[in-house]
Every structure is written in C-alpha cells, then in structure tokens.
Amino acid sequence: MKKLSILLLTGTLLCLSGGCDSYRNRDTRIAISYLCVGQDDMFELYDITATYSDGKGRVHTSPVTSFPWKVEYSYMPLGVHAQLEINFQPKPHIVRKESYTVGCNAYINWDCLQGGGENYSETDCYKISAEEVDAFLNDMDRKIAEGKYKLKNPSITNKSGFVQD
C-alpha cells in the first residue's frame, strides 16, 4: 500500500491574545494545519485519526474525515514539543490489512517569550487575531496546493517547516 505523504504546517505559532508575560505559565493557543496528498479512496480504505499530546501528559485523538485537516486553537503549554501523529487503520472489510503511522514533531518556538524573532516582535505578539491566523493558514494551504512550498524535513523544528521554491 502506497504511503501517503503528510505535509505538516506548524505555521507561525502565535499568542492570540494578552501580553506574552501573562502566558508564561498558562496554556495558550496554536493553530496547526496539515495537508494529505495520496489515494483518492483513502477514506474508503482507512479509518484515519490524528493524535497529539498537549505536553502535560494528556493525549487527544480526533477523527480525520477530509483533507486538509486542521486542529485550530488547540491548547498547548509554552515551550514544549508537541507530538503529532496521523494513524491509518484499515477498515474491517479490507483484506490486505496494513496500517501505519506518520509522525512529526512540532517544536513550539514562541517568539514572544524570547524577546522577538524573525517574524513577530514581542510587542506584536498579542496583537494577532484569530482571523489573522485563519487567513495565514488559508494562504499557506493555497500556496501548498499551487506547489509553491515543499516539505523541508519531516521533523519540524522551525517556524513553518516549508521552504519556498
């Protein structure tokens, strides 16, 4: 069975409201989007779920019924590695039972806790709205679909994990 390629977009992980200092010891929100490209009949062959850890020992699992699939505004603590996996389990009627997991690490690198970074300064961090995050994700999805971005490395340790051609 051909493996599906997973593009994980960690995007720019952003504080959505409040000053950065107030989030130092609190959960904050991130937006994650990833796009799956593969067999057209994948949803007839597999039960697909996404599993991710919130960094505090809690594991969340949700079904994936279409792509691109987004986990938006999921609560995660600051400065942790978030383990994300997409699991493909063959449906019962499939004779050739083959399952696999695609996993990626998304390093939560919060500019706002480090006095600014390449995209957002500390003073800008709290000004970014949920609408802007949605616009960012939609723009990235469009660029991926147009082939303007490609996966840099399956282990995502930078801001987006994508490099522009």
Predicted feature residues:
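C-terminal partner/receptor-binding element of secreted or periplasmic proteins
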Residues: 117-165
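Extracellular and analogous surface-interaction loops
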Residues: 23-25, 70-79, 149-164
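Bacterial Sec-dependent N-terminal signal peptides
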Residues: 14-39
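Mature extracytoplasmic domains of secretory-pathway proteins
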Residues: 55-110
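An anionic, turn-rich surface loop/hairpin at beta-sheet edges
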Residues: 81-99, 114-136
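Sec-dependent bacterial lipoprotein signal peptides
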Residues: 1-20
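Calcium-regulated, polybasic anionic-phospholipid
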Residues: 36-59
